């Protein structure tokens, strides 16, 4: 019997052209390179005889299952995604794809974020999902707008310093 999990929230089906290209490249690598490699290794492990005590065979079966699961996910997700490759009609306001610089009103610290789709978030690069609490609070704000965002660490006040969009 499987464990019950509450349904996951629907994520926004938006992605940047770069993010779409990365997901397609990952799918291509999994399907054309990694999967055939694992299938060959699995066949070699199966040829060794008794599969009940064959750790290599068990490992390769699990690895193949993980690859197939990711391939299915990426195939479905790429079909559902909408690539946003045009700048918004109002480049002074914060929308999907914006690179924003914020000032934390409490500490004065400057923070830089890019609002991207949920499939391309990267905390190290400052890329936050459009579904995140901060991005939701940021949408439609303009330079010098002050706003509050309810973050996991509590309520914070920010001021929008810069709004930029990458040239496409």
Curated annotation (Swiss-Prot):
<dbReference type="GO" id="GO:0003677">
    <property type="term" value="F:DNA binding"/>
</dbReference>
<dbReference type="GO" id="GO:0006354">
    <property type="term" value="P:DNA-templated transcription elongation"/>
</dbReference>
<dbReference type="Pfam" id="PF03449">
    <property type="entry name" value="GreA_GreB_N"/>
</dbReference>
<dbReference type="InterPro" id="IPR023459">
    <property type="entry name" value="Tscrpt_elong_fac_GreA/B_fam"/>
</dbReference>
<dbReference type="InterPro" id="IPR028624">
    <property type="entry name" value="Tscrpt_elong_fac_GreA/B"/>
</dbReference>
<protein>
    <recommendedName>
        <fullName>Transcription elongation factor GreB</fullName>
    </recommendedName>
</protein>
<dbReference type="InterPro" id="IPR036805">
    <property type="entry name" value="Tscrpt_elong_fac_GreA/B_N_sf"/>
</dbReference>
<keyword id="KW-0804">Transcription</keyword>
<keyword id="KW-0238">DNA-binding</keyword>
<dbReference type="InterPro" id="IPR036953">
    <property type="entry name" value="GreA/GreB_C_sf"/>
</dbReference>
<dbReference type="GO" id="GO:0032784">
    <property type="term" value="P:regulation of DNA-templated transcription elongation"/>
</dbReference>
<dbReference type="InterPro" id="IPR006358">
    <property type="entry name" value="Tscrpt_elong_fac_GreB"/>
</dbReference>
<dbReference type="InterPro" id="IPR022691">
    <property type="entry name" value="Tscrpt_elong_fac_GreA/B_N"/>
</dbReference>
<dbReference type="InterPro" id="IPR001437">
    <property type="entry name" value="Tscrpt_elong_fac_GreA/B_C"/>
</dbReference>
<dbReference type="Pfam" id="PF01272">
    <property type="entry name" value="GreA_GreB"/>
</dbReference>
<keyword id="KW-0805">Transcription regulation</keyword>
<dbReference type="InterPro" id="IPR018151">
    <property type="entry name" value="TF_GreA/GreB_CS"/>
</dbReference>
<comment type="similarity">
    <text>Belongs to the GreA/GreB family. GreB subfamily.</text>
</comment>
<comment type="function">
    <text>Necessary for efficient RNA polymerase transcription elongation past template-encoded arresting sites. The arresting sites in DNA have the property of trapping a certain fraction of elongating RNA polymerases that pass through, resulting in locked ternary complexes. Cleavage of the nascent transcript by cleavage factors such as GreA or GreB allows the resumption of elongation from the new 3'terminus. GreB releases sequences of up to 9 nucleotides in length.</text>
</comment>
<dbReference type="GO" id="GO:0070063">
    <property type="term" value="F:RNA polymerase binding"/>
</dbReference>
């Amino acid at each position: 019997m499987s464990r019950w999990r509450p349904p996951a929230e629907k994520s926004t089906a938006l992605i940047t052209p770069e993010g779409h290209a990365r997901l397609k490249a990952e799918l291509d690598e999994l399907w054309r390179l990694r999967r055939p490699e694992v299938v060959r290794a699995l066949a070699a492990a199966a040829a060794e005889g008794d599969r009940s005590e064959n750790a290599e065979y068990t490992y390769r079966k699990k690895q193949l299952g993980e690859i197939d699961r990711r391939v299915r996910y990426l195939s479905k997700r790429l079909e559902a995604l909408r690539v946003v490759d045009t700048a918004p009609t109002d480049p002074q306001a914060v929308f999907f794809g914006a690179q924003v610089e914020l000032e934390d009103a409490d500490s004065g610290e400057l923070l830089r974020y890019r609002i991207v789709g949920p499939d391309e978030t990267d905390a190290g690069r400052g890329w936050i999902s459009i579904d995140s609490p901060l991005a939701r609070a940021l949408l439609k704000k303009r330079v010098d707008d002050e706003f509050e965002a309810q973050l996991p660490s509590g309520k914070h006040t920010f001021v929008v310093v810069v709004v930029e969009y990458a040239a496409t």
